[in-house]
Regions:
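Hydrophobic, small-residue-rich alpha-helical packing segments that form membrane-like cores
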Residues: 1-3
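Extended, hydrophobic/aromatic-rich amphipathic alpha-helical segments that build helical scaffolds
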Residues: 18, 67, 109-143, 161-175
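Flexible, polar/acidic helix-loop-strand segments at domain edges
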Residues: 58-114
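Residue-level signal for threonine
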Residues: 56-57, 133, 217
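A broad, low-specificity signal marking well-ordered, structured residues that form hydrophobic/aromatic
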Residues: 15-17, 68, 91, 140, ...
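Active-site rim segments in enzyme catalytic domains, especially the processed small/beta chain
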Residues: 37-61, 66-73
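Conserved, well-structured core segments that form or line functional sites
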Residues: 148
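Long, intrinsically disordered, low-complexity segments
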Residues: 8-43, 49-53, 104, 109, ...
Length: 238
């Protein structure tokens, strides 16, 4: 099931194609995802400066109430008490056994797993054929059935594209994929602006189309005068 993917008892199973290996027995090789995302304490305030990450309400609402991934990834309460300011906590990497240390655990981090392959396959078929194929439905429904939610059918190109965008968020959240997805879909800037406004952050004021790419390191431009800086970063070029 979905929760097993993020359990040390099932690490490096078939779902995991490539994972960063961690070991709690060695300080330099232990993971700290729980430290940064939380919670591991009873009070949210204890994460100030080293965590306290929260999910926007719009993301929480992307889940069906019966979706098994919801209760594994997000939480509105901790031991029966709501979080401060009604925040939504990220608990994806929380060890349900209670043996995990907040800043010192051995849970591997998934870089590439089978669910990602299925979602990429379904997305590619929809883009290629201009509509979802039987194989595309099979791929995405395999993931949805594992999550305990209904299969989908009879969608057009745009509907299936929107479904894939939401399904990747529900399935792969906090695994390091979202920015790359938003860039690929051409909606990075509008999404950052919208979410920033929702959570009352100023981040949306500074994002621009230039952020679809990173700047070419100045050291490389100095080495090769034929290199042109990526759009939006030209002022860094000498």
């Amino acid at each position: 099931n979905y929760s097993d993917i993020f359990s040390q008892a099932f690490e490096n199973e078939q779902e995991h194609i490539f994972s960063i290996q961690f070991n709690a027995d060695y300080t330099d090789f232990s993971a700290r995802m729980l430290w940064y995302l939380g919670p591991g304490k009873e009070e949210w305030d204890k994460f100030n400066g080293l965590g306290g990450s929260s999910a926007p309400t719009s993301f929480y609402n992307k889940y069906d109430e019966w979706d098994l991934r919801l209760e594994h990834n997000l939480a509105k309460t901790w031991r029966g008490q709501p979080f401060k300011d009604s925040r939504i906590a990220v608990i994806k990497y929380w060890d349900r056994t209670g043996k995990q240390m907040l800043d010192h655990d051995g849970l591997n981090f998934p870089v590439f797993r089978y669910a990602d392959v299925l979602l990429m396959y379904a997305e590619a078929l929809n883009e290629w054929k201009g509509a979802p194929t039987e194989e595309a439905y099979d791929a995405v429904n395999e993931i949805r059935l594992r999550a305990g939610i209904d299969e989908v059918e009879d969608l057009n190109y745009k509907q299936f594209q929107s479904l894939i965008q939401d399904e990747r968020a529900r399935e792969l959240c906090y695994e390091g994929h979202r920015r790359f997805d938003l860039v690929r879909w051409g909606i990075l800037v509008e999404t950052v602006k919208r979410v920033s406004k929702e959570i009352n952050s100023k981040g949306g004021e500074y994002v621009s189309e230039a952020h679809n790419l990173c700047p070419i390191p100045q050291t490389e431009i100095i080495k090769n005068s034929n290199l042109e800086q990526n759009p939006g970063y030209e002022t860094t070029q000498k």
